[in-house]
């Protein structure tokens, strides 16, 4: 979609509509029906590649403003054909992707889908529409859902919460013009969102109440207590990111009862380094520099 990099794809990115992504900047071409059908089939082929590599599960990313999410959201989908307009139409591409993925997965590959509970900005998908999509995914055979929210090209901090270290991010950008642009306007474009532990829980509980399939809770998990709270609220699984970037052995240390809380302070330095060749925690970098 409009998150693709031409330098990587070696072709002009394609998307549901030709809406510009300022974070690229990316100027995508609107997909033809043939493009859409071909792309849906490619998801199925990817399942076979995953099987060949030894995986027993795949995750379809239908959130965060990437390709499938761009079809679902009225913010990025201005189509006038069978793939735009009503929620049923905007979800048609996801339905076709799920058909291809489930056919390829057969009975030996689990199909997990990451989906939004809200896009996180005015003009995007709100909770009720997202809940309807989740119900569709349950009907279409998803084995589990990862419940998240936010839109990388419009509301990135709704996903992460906290603030983005703009100067750190610009430092690792390779495009000189983007470095200048981000330093000048990044603070206005990337709005802060208040962080608190378990920040998606209240929304996720609405989905838990309405759905019967296994759900994965993600968002603001920094301690054993956080994890226990999610599990006690009938989420079958939890997913973590920043706490494991800070300490990849965090789960094992909790199991051994050596540690019950991550020392991650959610400064988002690790996220700001996404334009570098590595995503690392500043605490670990500082510790290494002292040795």
Regions found by a protein language model. Name each.
Residues 1-291:
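Flavin-dependent oxidoreductase catalytic cores
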């Amino acid at each position: 979609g409009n998150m693709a990099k031409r330098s990587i794809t070696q072709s002009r990115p394609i998307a549901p509509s030709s809406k510009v992504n300022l974070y690229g900047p990316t100027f995508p071409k609107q997909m033809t029906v043939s493009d859409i059908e071909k792309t849906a089939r490619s998801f199925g082929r990817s399942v076979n590649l995953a099987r060949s590599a030894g995986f027993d599960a795949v995750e379809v990313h239908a959130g965060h403003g990437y390709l499938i999410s761009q079809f679902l959201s009225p913010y990025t989908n201005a189509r006038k054909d069978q793939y735009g307009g009503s929620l049923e139409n905007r979800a048609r591409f996801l339905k076709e992707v799920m058909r291809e993925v489930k056919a390829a997965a057969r009975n030996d590959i689990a199909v997990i889908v990451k989906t939004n509970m809200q896009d996180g900005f005015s003009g995007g998908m709100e909770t009720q529409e997202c809940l309807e999509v989740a119900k569709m995914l349950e009907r279409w055979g998803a084995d589990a859902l990862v419940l998240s929210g936010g839109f990388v090209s419009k509301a990135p901090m709704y996903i992460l919460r906290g603030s983005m270290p703009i100067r750190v991010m610009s430092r690792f950008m390779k495009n000189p013009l983007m470095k200048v642009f981000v330093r000048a306007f990044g603070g206005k474009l990337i709005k802060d969102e208040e962080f608190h532990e378990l920040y998606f829980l209240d929304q996720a509980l609405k989905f838990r109440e309405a759905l019967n399939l296994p759900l994965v809770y993600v968002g603001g998990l920094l301690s054993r207590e956080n994890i226990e709270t999610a599990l006690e609220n009938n989420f079958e699984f939890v997913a973590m990111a920043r706490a494991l970037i800070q300490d990849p052995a965090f789960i094992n240390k909790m199991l051994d009862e050596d540690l019950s809380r991550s020392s991650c302070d959610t400064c988002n330095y690790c996220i700001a380094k996404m334009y570098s060749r590595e995503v690392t925690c500043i605490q670990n970098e500082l510790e290494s520099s002292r040795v």
